Structure formats: C-alpha cells, structure tokens
Amino acid sequence: MPFRHLYVFGSTVAQSERLMLGGACDLVWDKGQVGLGDLTLPWGPQHEMILFGMYVPSKQNREDGRGALSARLRAGSVLRVDRPNSRGVKAHPTEKPVELMRRLVESSSGIDDVVLDMFAGSGSTLVAAILSGRKAIGAEVAAEHYETALARCVAAEGLWRAGQEAY
C-alpha cells in the first residue's frame, strides 16, 4: 500500500489541512538537551515538532513487521532520543539520530516495505530503513550530503547483511 504514513519535521497538525490526511497527530522529539534558539529568551528549545499523517491505516504487526495489529503500534507522542553531537561530529546541520528515525520507520512500515525520504540529508532515515529490513529510496540535492548519505547506506547495508548471516 503506497503512502501509508507521512512524517514532517517542524510541522504540526494545525499546518496540515491542505494535505487532506485520513488522520494526523503531533509528535514531539525531546532532544535531551537545550539548543541555542533565541538567546534573548529565558527558555531554550529542547524539542522539535513532528507531524504524523496517515492516509491508510496499517494492519501489520509491529513486533516483527508482519501479521495482525499489535499493541506496539500505539506509543506515546513524545520521543526521547538525544540529538547528534553538535561539535563538528554531525554530517548535516539538521541531522536526525538513526535511533529516532528507526522508531518512526518501524512504526509505519513492515519488513521489505519501501521507505522514501525526499530530503535525505545525511541519510539517517535511509540507514534506519536498511537496518530495519526495509528498502530505502532517498533524494538529496546537495552533492556533499548525497555522498555522505550514500556512504552511510553502503555501510548500513553491510551491517544488515552481516546481521542476517548471523541467524
């Protein structure tokens, strides 16, 4: 079933009306530490909003990616995952942690499904998809980020294959 679920970082349900989604909710990514934001304010941003949109309800089991609906599908709307280190270690200015993207990928797709990221950046979503047994398709306009994402995907594919051979 194509286009089951959609995630948009920095967007909210209030901004999603034109998408005509079958269902939507706001998720909050708790980054675990305060960011810079507006330094004139006494409060610093520690979170990022994520719009979750659903076109068609999924009936796949979230325990192993196959079968009937399981309780794992329903989770809290606050995702607590530390953001990548900002001291020159990040591969992209808005890089997302693979663990965060893995949670989203596994919640919204099954084994062998295709995960599409039209703004791949450093490839975190694609890596999460590969490591979760999904097929990954990504697009990135910046050549340097494309190269980074490609290298990360190749490495993830090797890790995934090695893990499969261990079973």
Regions found by a protein language model. Name each.
Residues A149-L150:
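Conserved SAM-binding loop
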Residues M1-Y146:
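Core catalytic lobe of class I
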Residues K135-G138, C153-E157:
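Generic alpha-helical hydrophobic packing signal
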Residues V154-Y167:
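Class I S-adenosyl-L-methionine-dependent methyltransferase module
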